[in-house]
Amino acid sequence: MQGLMQAHPLMISSMLEHARRYHPDTEIVSKTCEQTIVRSNYRTLSHRAKQMAQTLIAMGVKPGDRVATLAWNTHRHLELYFAVSGIGAVLHTVNPRLFPEQIEYILNHAESGVLFFDITFASLVEDLTPALPHVRRFIAMTDADHMAGMPAQAEPYEDLIAQQDGNYDWPVFDENAASSLCYTSGTTGNPKGVLYSHRSTYLHSLLVCQVDGLQLSSADSTLLAV
């Protein structure tokens, strides 16, 4: 006999839905690489994450596919955290402080098919492109007005997201499915990949809210340094 109380998978997307439902107007502040301060909220984050989820599906991204980011802490990167994992794909966050040779190795080893990058990494991406056979789409995390100097094959993030209406329901699947992928700095040998699941990320998020954790609540304002 199995219990039926709260018998649902621990999905990352459900955390965003909780925030949208109960804290829709709570402010989220970030700064873009274009030096613009962006003030958003959980309602807008949810809508744009769903638009990006639709964008990824339109690109042909499927569950289990790796989607890489080479980016700083911005509102667009946050949207990707939820959008990529939300459709069952794996967000592959690449450490921009690694050597170019290590970044090349990591992207190829993970076989990431899409690369989202901040405009500060345009020249790095251009130099690496010939050595990245698995990457089929390059997305500059900016708008059309800031595409000067971007690699020729790059597409502006905002143009892609604007093509979708955000009318999307997050799928429910195995909570043990991979949600994100990080690589070590390669202290010995090449960097090693570490896979996180929806379940592990969900439980970690709950733990930081506990009294013996960071004791965070909806009453707190936090500055995240990732």
Q: Could you say what each language-model-derived stretch is?
A:
Residues V67, G88, T187:
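Conserved G/P- and acidic residue-centered "switch" motifs that form tight phosphate/ATP-binding loops
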Residues A71-T74, N95, L216, T222-V226:
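Conserved AMP-binding
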Residues H77-S85, L91, T201, V208:
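Short hydrophobic alpha-helical segments of the AMP-binding
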Residues M15-E17, A58-M59, G86-A162, F173:
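Structural core segment of the AMP-binding/adenylate-forming
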Residues R39-S40, L98, E155, F173, ...:
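A broad, structural micro-motif
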Residues L56-V61, N167-A177, L181-A225:
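Conserved adenylate-forming
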Residues A7-V29, H47:
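A short N-terminal helical cap/helix-turn-helix that marks the beginning
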Residues I28-T74, L78-F82, F99-E104, P156-D159:
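Conserved AMP-binding/adenylate-forming core of the ANL superfamily
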